[in-house]
């Protein structure tokens, strides 16, 4: 495992590590190969804000799984503390936590830059969104006082996956942008010729836009109709026996 201290950057591969979790040992990012995953840290078990976060994450867990995305939690606590906390959440709040929680000794937290000395020895509320290739695509940091918005994290995963698949950019508050609604932004023209062509397309109504550098299209491009070829009927007829 890479033991360097400091936060990895966007575009970096998620550091390789073997960890102990409530679901057993895991090797990251290897065990998540082919899947996206949301790796998030929380300050401590049996704390009010963290409890609300875990309940919120679990409520949305099925939606994350629909996006081929797993959740992995972490704090500097022993695994029995995680298990007991899960039991408390189930018994008192009626929610079963189904995703793994890493029991960290502090090594992982330091390697990812999750501990800020000015805020104590607990991990901050960090989020790393990692794609199916093991590349870090989004990093979010929250202070201990503020719980995370899980709907926003889910939106971020959806947006990045859609952007990758369709070669577009996502506007603010997508899919409810104040200017273009659920439509997505077409990458800006890279040359003068491309810019002129883009303006021409806007004028012809082939695409929508305010200018060559701000054009957009439907989030779901119209698919070409597939021609269904009917099987040819045989000209042969069976003779009656």
Named regions from a protein language model:
Residues 1-241:
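Chalcogenol-based redox active-site neighborhoods
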């Amino acid at each position: 495992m890479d033991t360097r201290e400091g936060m990895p950057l966007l575009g970096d591969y998620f550091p390789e590590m073997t960890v102990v979790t409530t679901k057993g040992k895991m090797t990251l990012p290897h065990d998540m190969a082919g899947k996206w995953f949301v790796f998030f840290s929380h300050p401590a078990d049996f704390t009010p804000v963290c409890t609300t976060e875990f309940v919120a994450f679990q409520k949305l867990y099925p939606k994350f799984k629909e996006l081929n995305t797993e959740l992995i939690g972490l704090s500097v606590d022993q695994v029995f503390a995680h298990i007991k906390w899960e039991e408390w959440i189930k018994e008192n709040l009626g929610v079963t936590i189904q995703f793994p929680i890493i029991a960290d000794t502090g090594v992982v937290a330091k390697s990812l830059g999750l501990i800020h000395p000015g805020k104590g020895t607990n991990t901050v509320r960090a989020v790393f969104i990692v794609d199916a290739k093991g590349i870090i695509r989004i990093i979010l940091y929250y202070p201990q006082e503020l719980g995370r918005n899980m709907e926003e994290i889910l939106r971020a995963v959806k947006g990045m996956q859609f952007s990758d698949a369709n070669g577009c950019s996502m506007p603010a508050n997508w899919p409810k942008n104040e200017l273009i609604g659920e439509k997505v932004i077409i990458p800006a023209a890279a040359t003068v010729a491309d810019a002129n062509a883009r303006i021409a397309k806007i004028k012809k109504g082939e695409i929508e836009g305010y200018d060559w550098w701000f054009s957009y299209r439907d989030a779901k491009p119209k698919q070409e109709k597939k021609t269904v070829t009917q099987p040819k009927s045989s000209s042969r007829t069976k003779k009656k026996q």
